[in-house]
Design a protein with these regions (language model features):
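N-terminal small/glycine-rich loop or linker at the start of catalytic domains
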Residues: 2-11, 43-64, 98-106, 126-135, ...
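Glycine-rich, positively charged N-terminal anion/phosphate-binding segment
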Residues: 15-90
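Alpha/beta enzyme core
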Residues: 29, 78-112, 116-195, 209, ...
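Alpha/beta catalytic cores of nucleotide-metabolism and tRNA/nucleoside-modifying enzymes
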Residues: 6, 10, 16, 22, ...
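Hydrophobic faces of well-ordered beta-strands that scaffold small-molecule active sites
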Residues: 10-14, 35-37, 65-69, 92, ...
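Active-site beta-loop-alpha junctions enriched in small/polar residues
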Residues: 15-17, 40-42, 70-72, 97-99, ...
Length: 334
């Protein structure tokens, strides 16, 4: 990305409410080529909102780190970029893909896919206010009648974007099953900057298929890695032609979960961190016996010691099902 060399071709995409510093560090430790902050409002940055600035917190994790900003006014996006230049990060990412109603209703996120010219002007302003590389995360388009990823990607490249990540669904599709790899291939053919393919990558074969079908330069993994940071190890090995790594046993998975939540509590305090940890914790229940009941348990987490009780329940459920938690093959990822 510009002057940044990535250690791996699989990177961790931004997700509001999930990609805080502890989550990013965990993914980087397991091989994410870069990580990105939760999306940050350009207006809030310009107005100096302290809560928003806290989302930028960087933790040394061995991988390049980007700050993602969102907004629909080019000049404000430029001012916001200037406001964060003082912080420690490696690149600026522009959100042109968020489908959330509260974001698109203001004209930002994936609503920008309706206006390629505005996309270009936003990138131009951001590039003008930073010495760091600028990247863009976008969608296939707004809806079936507005498939604009190619036009938007070309406008962004011309304005100075150093990389484009394409989620292969329209805003109308949200996260419904099925992606369109062809749109990623079309963007790859249309621009010279690196292109990342994004959407429905849950295993190494998904990543290989995306690269094979689209010739993209790398893959961006987001939801698929929640509760499964080892996905980066498996994908990296596959993309680099290396043997598949050994999967973690249940103890390793629970150790990772506990450390992640511990860091959340250390950084935010129990009152803020534990409600946020409920959603993170649910993802670690994937593939386990008794997962439905365990996920309900996740919804009650209030104190850090509640997590220890949950982890004890996880092991008990596996034993009741006749499984050996120490045998990695008995508790595989789905």
């Amino acid at each position: 990305i510009g002057n940044i060399t990535l250690p791996h071709r699989a990177v961790f995409g931004p997700m509001a409410g999930f990609t805080d510093a502890p989550c990013r560090r965990l993914m980087a430790q397991h091989g994410a080529g870069f990580t990105v902050s939760e999306m940050v409002s350009s207006r809030a940055l310009v107005y100096g909102d302290h809560k928003t600035v806290s989302l930028l917190k960087a933790e040394p994790n061995g991988a390049p780190y980007g700050v993602q900003i969102f907004g629909e006014v080019p000049e404000i996006m430029g001012e916001a970029t200037a406001a964060i230049e003082q912080y420690a990060f490696d690149f600026v990412d522009i959100n042109m893909g968020c489908p959330a109603p509260k974001i698109v209703s203001g004209g930002a996120g994936s609503k920008l896919m309706l206006d390629p010219d505005r996309c270009g002007r936003i990138v131009e302003q951001v590039v003008a206010h930073t010495k760091r590389p600028v990247t863009v995360k976008m969608r296939k388009g707004w809806d079936a009648d507005h498939i604009t990823a190619v036009e938007c990607a070309k406008a962004c490249e011309q304005a100075g974007a150093a990389l484009v990540a394409v989620h292969a669904r329209t805003r109308e599709q949200m996260y419904t099953p099925g992606i369109d790899p062809e749109i990623i291939a079309r963007v790859k053919d249309a621009v010279k900057v690196p292109v990342l393919g994004n959407g429905d990558i849950h295993c190494a074969e998904d990543a290989l298929r995306m690269v094979r079908q689209t010739h993209c330069d790398g893959v961006m993994i987001a939801r698929g890695a929640l509760g499964d940071p080892w996905l980066f190890e498996r994908v990296n090995a596959a993309l680099e032609g290396l043997p598949a790594p050994k999967e973690p046993n249940l103890q390793a998975r629970m150790n990772a979960l506990r450390r992640q939540v511990e860091e959340m509590v250390e950084q935010k305090g129990e009152f803020v961190a534990m409600p946020q940890a409920r959603a993170q914790t649910m993802h670690y229940m994937k593939g386990l016996k008794g997962a439905a009941a365990l996920r309900r348990y996740c919804c009650t987490l209030t104190h850090l010691e509640d997590l220890d009780e949950l982890i004890a329940a996880v092991f008990e459920e596996q034993r009741k099902a006749g499984l050996d938690p120490d045998d990695v093959r008995e508790v595989p990822f789905p």
